[in-house]
């Protein structure tokens, strides 16, 4: 394998049963993706502005053949064993799918390697192929650029493949390595082979005359010295195309060129696209190794609202076809040739930076389960869950159905949890704040939680949700703190202020906090897709964190009266939550479930959550005499979600630290199950039998579970597991936190689920990007660009190396003895102070004495560090307090 800084942990090596569900996404942020399976198949071709889970692009594949003295030694598809269902998967088409055998496009029926070993360390995948009958050793490395703070190069619509072949025999061998690609989604292709300097390019365009948003192009690019090309595979019916291609490939000699002057008149009876092949020949002496590179690039420039429902109340109206928008990548590269050649020409630099990021994570002192959680979820950023709009803005689904997105609109009560963009690509995260304040804010100040496309085309009809609404304010503070730009805050401060005031506004129909008590009392929509009523710590702590953040921002915006008002309201609310909602073990909801009158102020005709029932029918049960879908005395995993956000943003304690710690321990003790075999779950099943997991909510002994509790309560969500684990680690409960992470990752080991696809309400579910909080929780990263301060307090004492990404740069910090070395590997970082708890004695920076104020080392000036720079701090002694 290439690029191995140290021995690879076995958990990242996938063989045999653990290889079965591996599907590793390749592509850029907002470009869609294609995935590489654990056996080397190209699948999940989600590149045409919508998901295509478990879908092939015709019979696209890599293949290799070996010849000697004009005779064929062997020819194999560059795949390992077929691991799909032998009877076929369900399909909407007749004469296809279940009951019709293994998918033909998987090439299960074409000779391939006996075995394969997959190594997945995001953003790089590596495969070794094994077959005693093949003369040579074959490896494949695949990646797409993924470089923190470099969002342009990380948004390239490309997948890059390097195939290495070693002749391990005692005689010369002629090898041919070929890439066959289908002209995806095209009925009648136009394939053009050109050479640009050292690059050979097969460009796939279309003669189709359908709607503009369905058009696009792809390219194969290589720089091999001896290149062969088959512009078109045979146009025929039945199995002619693949049959003749393999017949012509699996024989000695060069490939037969084939061109057609006219577009295809009739489509294949099995709806196969047209195909083309580019191959590189190389003669290798005994013991010689050669690497051949291929780029696959794509360009489907226009997105459209394919999911649009004209009959949905509150939806914008339009005539004719749904509106379209241009993808960001299409504003940067004119077509697939432009993006592919750009990536190819800069391959070495892009790979070096991508591998540097990978090695900084995998070479760190983070526990392997945390590395695995981050490794397994960052691929969501390059999946079809994300769209990057023409101006560079991020817009997202919650997850993905097989052929379309799941739950549109950058849903704030789900996107609240993801922490990856804010740390690795903060400029992209800021676009989420900017668009929600610019396009989601109602005249009343409320923030709707789903964003319509195109931007500015209307509001979601459900209105604000409490967790998402206050999350926007907390995260605006986080973005300002990490950016350090008062002008940015000033631009959005009027929106933030109005959002805070919405809590007590008479125009708020949900009557959250009309008396400014610091507690949410009214109707509170939330991420369980229904509403809570009455005081509860979950949503009130979100309110408290938002009030605390608003108080600080108001002072910075020269609004001291509002700052004091927010501070005082928060103080009252905090006292109430600790006094009235903490039961000695955890925080609960305060509501008399038998009091029907608690609902009557909110029976105003607006629908209940996601239900179509009338409000009272949705929330009141005559049979049980009880308000439905509440938490009541339950121990909710999310019960102090606002404190988690506050800890991440550096807002301090919202509640009693002792109570917070006790509540976190209770969540672990009550909600974590080492085995779910005896657990009853009538909801969606994301963990089962002997698997371990953290439940959303439980009702401990001595409490009463509502007859009809909050939806999903019995489920296990990995996004909540990562959140809770990081919060436990933040608060010093490291073993408990790691136990939860291990459980989540054990379920995603490849044998039952894809390690790179955490599911919830669909595939590549964005809540799972809460996993990135584990990185900062364990390293104890503290960063505030406003004062140029960075610091670390690792969860475990002793020497270590930790990844960081902050400001406009990223790198590692090395802690060794009494020496702290801050290393920048990409971007730049401007710092004035270094905070390291546990310091004692004198301090020097790069050999020069500096002042120290407790845990804070005062560097004396702004230090701007760029890639390759390091800051070395020596102290008399260092050990975490």
Language model features by range: what are they?
Residues 1-8, 13-16, 22, 126, ...:
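Acidic/polar, glycine-enriched structural segments that form the non-catalytic walls/loops
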Residues 517-557, 565-576:
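Hydrophobic, small-residue-rich alpha-helical packing segments that form membrane-like cores
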């Amino acid at each position: 394998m290439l690029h191995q800084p140290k021995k690879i942990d076995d958990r990242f090596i996938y063989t045999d049963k653990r290889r079965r569900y591996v599907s590793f996404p390749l592509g850029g942020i907002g470009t869609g993706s294609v995935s590489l399976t654990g056996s080397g198949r190209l699948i999940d071709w989600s590149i045409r502005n919508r998901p295509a889970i478990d879908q092939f692009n015709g019979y696209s594949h890599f293949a290799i053949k070996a010849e000697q003295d004009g005779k064929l030694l062997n020819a194999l598809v560059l795949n390992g064993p077929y691991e799909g269902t032998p009877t076929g998967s369900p399909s909407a088409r007749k004469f296809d799918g279940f009951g019709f055998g293994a998918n033909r496009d998987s090439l299960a029926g074409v000779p391939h390697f006996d075995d394969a070993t997959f190594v997945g360390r995001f953003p790089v995948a590596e495969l070794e192929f094994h077959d005693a009958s093949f003369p040579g050793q074959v490896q494949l490395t695949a990646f797409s650029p993924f470089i923190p703070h470099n969002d342009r190069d990380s948004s390239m619509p490309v997948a890059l493949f390097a195939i290495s072949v070693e002749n391990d025999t005692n005689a010369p061998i002629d090898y041919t390595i070929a890439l066959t690609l289908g002209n995806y989604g095209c009925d009648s292709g136009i394939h053009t082979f050109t050479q640009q300097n050292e690059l050979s390019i097969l460009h796939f365009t279309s003669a189709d005359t359908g709607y503009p948003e369905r058009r696009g192009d792809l390219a194969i690019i290589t720089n091999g010295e001896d290149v062969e090309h088959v512009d078109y595979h045979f146009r025929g019916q039945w199995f002619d195309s693949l049959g003749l291609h393999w017949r012509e490939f699996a024989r000695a000699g060069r490939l037969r060129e084939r061109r057609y002057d006219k577009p295809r008149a009739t489509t294949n009876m099995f709806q196969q696209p047209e195909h083309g092949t580019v191959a590189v020949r190389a003669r290798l002496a005994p013991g010689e190794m050669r690497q051949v590179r291929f780029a696959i690039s794509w360009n489907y420039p226009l997105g459209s609202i394919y999911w649009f429902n004209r009959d949905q109340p509150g939806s914008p109206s339009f005539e004719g076809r749904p509106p379209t928008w241009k993808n960001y990548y299409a504003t940067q590269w004119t077509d697939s040739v432009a993006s592919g050649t750009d990536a190819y020409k800069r391959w070495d630099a892009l790979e070096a930076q991508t591998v540097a990021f990978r090695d900084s994570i995998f070479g760190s002192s983070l526990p392997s389960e945390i590395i695995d959680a981050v490794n397994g979820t960052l691929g969501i950023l390059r999946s079809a869950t994300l769209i990057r709009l023409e101006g560079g803005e991020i817009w997202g689904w919650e997850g993905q159905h097989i052929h379309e997105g799941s739950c549109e609109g950058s849903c704030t009560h789900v996107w609240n949890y993801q922490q990856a963009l804010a740390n690795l690509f903060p400029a992209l995260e800021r676009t989420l704040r900017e668009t929600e304040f610019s396009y989601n804010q109602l005249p009343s100040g409320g923030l709707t939680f789903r964003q319509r496309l195109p931007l500015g085309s209307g509001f979601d009809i459900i209105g604000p949700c409490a967790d998402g609404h206050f999350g926007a304010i907390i995260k605006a503070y986080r973005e300002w703190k990490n950016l350090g730009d008062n002008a940015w805050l000033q631009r959005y401060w009027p929106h933030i202020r109005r959002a805070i005031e919405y809590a007590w506004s008479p125009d708020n129909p949900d009557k959250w906090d009309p008396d400014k008590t610091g507690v949410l009392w009214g109707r509170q929509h939330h991420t369980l897709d229904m509403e809570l009523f009455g005081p509860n710590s979950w949503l009130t702590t979100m309110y408290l964190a938002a009030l605390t953040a608003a108080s600080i921002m108001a002072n910075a915006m020269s609004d001291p009266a509002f700052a004091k008002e927010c501070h005082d309201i928060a103080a009252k609310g905090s006292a109430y939550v600790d006094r009235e909602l903490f039961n000695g073990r955890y925080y609960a909801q305060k509501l008399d479930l038998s009091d029907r009158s608690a609902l009557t102020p909110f029976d105003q005709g607006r629908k209940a959550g996601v239900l179509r029932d009338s409000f009272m029918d949705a929330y009141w049960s005559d049979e049980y005499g009880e308000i439905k879908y509440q938490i009541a005395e339950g121990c909710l995993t999310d019960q102090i979600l606002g404190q988690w956000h506050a800890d991440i943003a550096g807002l301090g304690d919202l509640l009693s630290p002792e109570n917070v710690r006790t509540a976190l321990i209770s969540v672990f003790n009550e909600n974590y199950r080492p085995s779910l075999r005896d657990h009853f779950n009538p909801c969606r099943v994301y963990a089962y039998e002997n698997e371990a997991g953290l439940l959303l909510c439980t009702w401990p002994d001595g409490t009463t579970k509502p007859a009809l509790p909050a939806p999903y309560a019995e489920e296990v969500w990995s996004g909540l597991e990562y959140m809770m684990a990081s919060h436990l680690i933040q608060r010093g409960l490291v073993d408990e936190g790691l136990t939860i992470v291990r459980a989540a990752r054990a379920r995603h080991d490849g044998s039952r689920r894809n390690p790179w696809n955490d599911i919830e309400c669909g595939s590549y579910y964005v809540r799972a990007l809460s996993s990135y909080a584990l990185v900062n929780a364990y390293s104890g990263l503290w960063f505030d660009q406003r004062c140029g301060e960075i610091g670390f307090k690792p969860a475990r004492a002793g020497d270590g190396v930790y990844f960081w990404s902050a400001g406009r740069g990223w790198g590692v910090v090395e802690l060794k003895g009494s020496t702290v070395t801050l290393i920048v590997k990409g971007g730049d970082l401007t710092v004035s102070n270094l905070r390291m708890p546990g310091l004692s004695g004198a301090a020097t920076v790069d050999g020069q004495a500096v002042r120290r104020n407790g845990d804070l080392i005062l560097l004396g000036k702004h230090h701007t560090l760029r890639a390759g720079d390091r800051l070395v701090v020596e102290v008399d002694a260092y050990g975490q307090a």
